[in-house]
Amino acid sequence: MKILVAVAVFFLVSTQLFAEEIDANDDLNYWSDWSDSDQIKEAMPEPFEHLLQRIARRPKPQQFFGLMGKRDADSSVEKQVALLKALYGHGQISHKRHKTDSFVGLMGKRALNSVAYERSAMQNYERRRK
């Protein structure tokens, strides 16, 4: 047991001495050496630079999956404006089918008009009671 303690103390002392030798060789202007962007580019190896670029890039639109599902890869502002014009009668009717009497959200399908929703809720309640 005493041998293990002696080895541990020797190891700690040798690492402390080694760290002091490294500290003595360092300049005080360490951070000012890296201020030039050319030095950073030269010092950074190519795979590391490529890795940083991959981390920093934004996800492509087709890679984004939100709460409402997958987005179209070709969706744009112009398409959204054309869709709004078609809905409000200022343009041609789009090929997409729009249901205005129901809404599908996180809690499931809901009717937008309250009378139909109450009727379907009562029918579901009656079916469960039987």
Swiss-Prot record:
| Entry keyword set | Amidation, Cleavage on pair of basic residues, Neuropeptide, Neurotransmitter, Secreted, Signal
Q: Name the principal localization, coarsely classed.
A: secreted
Pfam families the UniProt entry points to: Tachykinin
| GO biological process, any | associative learning
Q: Which SMART domains match?
A: TK
Annotated positions for site Cleavage:
59-60, 63-67
Alphabetized InterPro entries for the sequence: Tachy_Neuro_lke_CS (IPR013055), Tachykinin_dom (IPR008215), Tachykinin_fam (IPR008216)
What is the superkingdom listed in this entry's lineage? Answer: Eukaryota
- Methionine amide-modified residues are 68, 107
Intracellular or extracellular location(s): Secreted
Q: Where is the signal peptide?
A: 1-19
Among its keywords, does the record have Secreted? yes
Q: What GO molecular function annotations does the UniProt record carry, in alphabetical order?
A: substance P receptor binding
Write out the GO cellular component annotations.
Answer: axon; extracellular region; extracellular space; neuronal cell body; neuronal dense core vesicle; synapse
- Record's keyword annotation contains Ubl conjugation: no
Propeptide residue ranges? 20-56
- Give a short account of what the protein does: Tachykinins are active peptides which excite neurons, evoke behavioral responses, are potent vasodilators and secretagogues, and contract (directly or indirectly) many smooth muscles.
Q: Which family does it belong to?
A: Belongs to the tachykinin family.
Protein known as: Protachykinin-1
Native organism is Mus musculus
Q: Which gene encodes it?
A: Tac1
